[in-house]
Amino acid sequence: MVLGRNHGTVMIAEESTAWPKVTGKAEDDGLGFSLKWNMGWMNDFLEYMKLDPYFRKFNHNKMTFSMTYAYSEKYVLVISHDEVVHLKKSMLEKMPGEPDDKFKNLKAAYTFMFCHPGKKLLFMGQEFGQLREWSEERELDWFLLGEEKHRDLKDFVQTLLKMYRKYPALYGTDTDPSGFEWINADDGDRSIYSFVRKSPTKRNNLLVVCNFTPVERPDYRVGVPKKKQYTLVLDENGQTAKKVFKAEKQDCDNRPFSFAYPLPAYGVAVFQY
């Protein structure tokens, strides 16, 4: 009724009991919500990101399990105020390591989040690395933007948002299983994930690589779907220099074509093809 009477309205459900068809149509015995919070993804994602990088290889499936049910509902990936209050720490402070490591971890985390199927919700202040937990009794710590690391994180999230809007591959097939393909979901030893997001037109698809360890991989080889040119459109520095890598005939990740890329510690790379 609400959706029918108010054009442009979005109704989002927070539900954690696995009740079926929350976003299904009412005429199909669904509840009729526009979107549902993906609580499973959120819990697994945050548990993984809080781990010391050494132990991530033993928890590799926490970042892949969500794809086994990603199309059962119309999901929104949520980092809400609930996750940055009551001694749970801010997103930046959840990350392991020294301050520089925390920022690098968070950039990798946000890249994975923005490239994973599902709409996005990131609570205010987490885009620039708020240190204190959120409180309704005070404003955000805007003074942190006077520090280079926090400005750099804000700029990186802004670049992610621009990339998200530019490429329909990141949103146009959120509810279509054919819009996602793992390249390598099983590289737990190196804690690297690689996958493809496909656009509705099958053009301007994106190849995504995320490294969740402080180990540099100077000759990281990634298998690719086709023998084409792959243009770098985002890296961990927020650079969009559009370097081009040409696939060659060399087996990798159970695919006949691949290319090598210098993947930094906590590095991310998004390629358009």
Please describe what each predicted stretch is.
Residues 100-103, 114-122, 126-273:
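Carbohydrate-interacting/catalytic domains
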Residues 1-120, 128, 135, 172-178, ...:
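Alpha-amylase-like alpha-glycosidases and glucanotransferases acting on alpha-linked glucans and related
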